[in-house]
Amino acid sequence: MELKDYYAIMGVKPTDDLKTIKTAYRRLARKYHPDVSKEPDAEARFKEVAEAWEVLSDEQRRAEYDQMWQHRNDPQFSRQFQHGDGQSFNAEDFDDIFSSIFGQHARQSRQRPAARGHDIEIEVAVFLEETLTEHKRTISYNLPVYNAFGMIEQEIPKTLNVKIPAGVGNGQRIRLKGQGTPGENGGPNGDLWLVIHIAPHPLFDIVGQDLEIVVPVSPWEAALGAKVTVPTLKESILLTIPPGSQAGQRLRVKGKGLVSKKQTGDLYAVLKIVMPPKPDENTAALWQQLADAQSSFDPRKDWGKA
């Protein structure tokens, strides 16, 4: 299995700090998100970037990855044992030696009982939009084959067509019975576990079953009220901005959050007041008229008060 260069994927250096990596991640997430990008490999690139961020954003996982990367070209000595003369031997050699010393009966007596196969976990990236309905997904993974010493001798590529149910959440585990490694001596197969990773979205943040989206509004829209078009996971809606709205105010849109078997969350629009560019002479005069009309208003009146 090839070890990916996550730093190259993110376009950063191994010495870069988390802030630099986070900036690169946000830029690439916006660039390759399927809702925005027109590049044919956008979805694959987006998932690759999300995978890299998942590792590099965690201090412990990043340290472990750096150590693995440093030793990626080291010989895999753990797959073989060495005789005194330096020649390697495998499990069959070990059995032959055991039989020659203790006899065939002893060899048969050391046969292990039936044992269940190993479970396998793989991470599956899912877009927020995909959580709304059940969808099919083709997944590929490597099925390890163990030798008599419990060590991996080879990996067999395997592909499955699976159903991802509606309402899956981040970190949720889906069990595919019997799709793990084969059991030993007639034992049952292990299972395959799909661990759901909800890919970060350029517009929405997840808060439990709810979603949050930052909605930019002009000062006059906040002051006078307005109707603005806001995207949701399914379609765009017309959101009413009440007169006198404040920056950071949260407006609830019922039933437009995440869907699960038990409930449907809401969408919260968080208002962000955006000032226009530096005013020209006429615009500045209008702002001054507003300031004169509201001369008694002090936005810092309660500043610092409990």
UniProtKB/Swiss-Prot annotation:
Q: Please give the InterPro entries that the UniProt record associates with this protein.
A: DNA-bd_curved-DNA, DnaJ_C, DnaJ_domain, DnaJ_domain_CS, HSP40/DnaJ_pept-bd, J_dom_sf
Every copy of the J domain together lies at 5-69
Purpose of the protein: DNA-binding protein that preferentially recognizes a curved DNA sequence. It is probably a functional analog of DnaJ; displays overlapping activities with DnaJ, but functions under different conditions, probably acting as a molecular chaperone in an adaptive response to environmental stresses other than heat shock. Lacks autonomous chaperone activity; binds native substrates and targets them for recognition by DnaK. Its activity is inhibited by the binding of CbpM.
MF (Gene Ontology):
bent DNA binding; unfolded protein binding
Cite the entry's keywords alphabetically. Answer: Chaperone, Cytoplasm, DNA-binding
What is the predominant subcellular site recorded for this chain?
A: cytoplasm
Output the CDD domains linked to this UniProt entry. Answer: DnaJ (cd06257), DnaJ_C (cd10747)
Q: Does the keyword Transit peptide apply?
A: no
Name of the protein in its database record: Curved DNA-binding protein
The superkingdom listed in its UniProt entry is Bacteria
GO CC list: cytoplasm; nucleoid
Chaperone as a keyword of this entry, yes or no, is yes
Q: Which organism is it from?
A: Escherichia coli O157:H7
Q: Which GO terms describe its biological process?
A: chaperone cofactor-dependent protein refolding; protein refolding
Give the UniProt subcellular location, in the record's own words: Cytoplasm, Nucleoid
